[in-house]
């Protein structure tokens, strides 16, 4: 089972959409009753739902925020009544887009009541796989309190998987000037405490809506529609029986060659605007093509500027595994320079028999590409520009933070960027003696 946690305004909005999609796919109506048409919908329903005494299905979801607003709108939304009422945990003060408030002051006061609810949900599970957290990194609650919660859960359940869906701030779609601070402080935490981070980015989502879906003025609703489709795709092999049943751990084993490099780019195909799905049947070659297209990536980094360490594709619908494998091989052979050669067979694909609502087939792409450093680099530059002048710092030190923490977060993020760069440049045939010598020096320097 997976316990789902959503925090902050963004996390709650995305999370609410995610549950709408998942409920639709499993044939569960807003009151939690099942009205679907195939047993497959119920076969692994317990991954995300608890079955209550009267035959109702209740999401294993915890909703938290430091102000009541967003949660009220979730509660009054289409599926608001399906959640367990005790699982709404909220404060009144808000975090005011301040990471320190979410992580150290306001959030720290609320965290124990959130942990109680998480514990209750975890105790309800027979065999807990792990946790998935939806949050944004630009604000105060999702980033500050979200990372606080992740580190607390890490302490209490050290051997369970921790997956995050993290929305990174983007230069074009920004609501606060301190986003780079909040994001850097969060990444500092995610590198250490999360197992897998699915990186989403408003700018990239915005571009997809604008360019591919031809929406002239995309709303957050449209962006969240994309996110929820992708989240549903990433998790579909956990929710439905497929030929290759994956769980969070198998996903991690295939995708993470080095523990710190666990930030994934996501892609989705077919991208059609909401109204036009039914007109053309897509073929496996077409969705494979579209899925690998850099314009389809949900974060603002171009995979052609780096190399894939690993990648994984999840195809949904009735299709032959053979055809899928051929298409995937085809992509790798044509673009071999974009894959590191020192991890052979670094692309895996799985097929899940049940397509998303309204489509015959679809695919979701998860890639671990070194080009994601572009995004960290971008945030880091913005961070440095402000931090050099200590701009806005008093909001954080006023909550008891120390400048040292900023410096550490900054250097951790820069280390991450250079690690990605190092593996991007690495080849299979490098002179091994040199490497050993370097390692030897490094070890001695560190001592």
Swiss-Prot record:
Task performed by this protein: Tubulin is the major constituent of microtubules, a cylinder consisting of laterally associated linear protofilaments composed of alpha- and beta-tubulin heterodimers. Microtubules grow by the addition of GTP-tubulin dimers to the microtubule end, where a stabilizing cap forms. Below the cap, tubulin dimers are in GDP-bound state, owing to GTPase activity of alpha-tubulin.
Family statement drawn from the similarity comment of this UniProt entry: Belongs to the tubulin family.
UniProt: Mg(2+) binding residues: 67
Binding site for GTP: 9, 67, 136, 140-142, 202, 224
SUPFAM superfamilies: Tubulin C-terminal domain-like, Tubulin nucleotide-binding domain-like
Keywords, alphabetical: Cytoplasm, Cytoskeleton, GTP-binding, Magnesium, Metal-binding, Microtubule, Nucleotide-binding
Biased composition (Polar residues): 411-425
UniProt keyword Cell inner membrane, yes or no: no
Main localization (coarse): cytoplasm
Gene name linked to the record: TUBB2
Full protein name: Tubulin beta-2 chain
Gene Ontology cellular-component terms listed: cytoplasm; microtubule
Pfam family, one: Tubulin
Cofactor: Mg(2+)
Chain positions covered by the region annotation Disordered: 411-447
Record InterPro entries: Beta_tubulin, Tub_FtsZ_C, Tubulin, Tubulin/FtsZ-like_C, Tubulin/FtsZ_2-layer-sand-dom, Tubulin/FtsZ_GTPase_sf, Tubulin_C, Tubulin_CS
Acidic residues: compositionally biased ranges: 427-440
Location relative to the cell: Cytoplasm, Cytoskeleton
SMART domains on file: Tubulin, Tubulin_C
Molecular-function GO term, any one: structural constituent of cytoskeleton
Record carries keyword Nucleus: no
Domain of life: Eukaryota
Quaternary structure annotation from Swiss-Prot or TrEMBL: Dimer of alpha and beta chains. A typical microtubule is a hollow water-filled tube with an outer diameter of 25 nm and an inner diameter of 15 nM. Alpha-beta heterodimers associate head-to-tail to form protofilaments running lengthwise along the microtubule wall with the beta-tubulin subunit facing the microtubule plus end conferring a structural polarity. Microtubules usually have 13 protofilaments but different protofilament numbers can be found in some organisms and specialized cells.
Gene Ontology BP, a term: microtubule-based process
